[in-house]
Amino acid sequence: MLLKIPNVLSKEQVETAKSKLLDADWADGNITAGYQSAKAKNNLQLPENSPIAIELGDIVLTALAQNNMFMSAALPLKIFPPLFNCYQGGRSFGVHVDNAIRQVPGTPVKVRTDISMTLFLSEPDEYEGGELVIEDTYGSQSVKLAAGDMVLYPATSLHSVTPVTKGRRLASFFWLQSMVNSDEKRTLLFDMDMAIQSLRAQVDDSPEIVQLTGVYHNLLRQWAQT
């Protein structure tokens, strides 16, 4: 499932993030690249222990915890702390696949990367190029969203970032381990949850809606790992 989630961050939160990132000390993006992706990666990134990265990461995680669409689609179990990158001056990231396992720095915690996420922090008209290109079942999907919007997609997907030829592209990127590691099962659960919420908004709870809700939770009970 490739899903675009609007307004994860408010305009005020985006502006706060951008102002802090403009004064940040950027490093070579290969500090977190795996062996394969390091050959394709050419961007700037905040070090994982950067106070700015930690502060902004907490803002992102708080916003996600309050976002019903994200929670329904991702069913998060463990979230890798958000990272932040910058593309400018022709920098890009060639086709690659994300590492299957990430260890949270300074801890023994390991996160299986079921879902990849990119949260855009620059408006589309602030830079040229910089599209996130994701290879999925239906071919290549080119994604370039408004600041504050986020895309999530299976971490098994090949993906790339096209060269930024003008301006600066700021974003947060991170991964999560879902309670349901199958993308197909997550998609079914998400579609069912969205349909139930839509029905509930149109009519009061009926026996049928209650029954469908029970089916959803029983499927989640069968498939979830906690």
Curated annotation (Swiss-Prot):
Residues binding 2-oxoglutarate: R169
Keywords, ordered alphabetically? Dioxygenase, Iron, Metal-binding, Oxidoreductase, Vitamin C
GO BP, sorted A to Z: DNA damage response; intracellular iron ion homeostasis
Which Pfam family name is an example for this entry?
2OG-FeII_Oxy_3
The record, for PROSITE patterns, names:
FE2OG_OXY (PS51471)
User: Which InterPro entries does the record match to this protein?
Assistant: Oxoglu/Fe-dep_dioxygenase_dom, PKHD_C, PKHD_hydroxylase, Pro_4_hyd_alph, Pro_4_hyd_alph_FE2OG_OXY
| Protein name, entry field | PKHD-type hydroxylase Sde_2812
Q: Where is the Fe2OG dioxygenase domain?
A: 78-178
GO MF terms here are:
2-oxoglutarate-dependent dioxygenase activity; iron ion binding; L-ascorbic acid binding
Cofactor(s) for this protein?
Fe(2+); L-ascorbate
Cofactor note from UniProt? Binds 1 Fe(2+) ion per subunit.
PANTHER family with a match to the protein in the record: PKHD-TYPE HYDROXYLASE YBIX
What is this enzyme's EC? 1.14.11.-
Binding-site residues for Fe cation, renumbered to this chain: H96, D98, H159
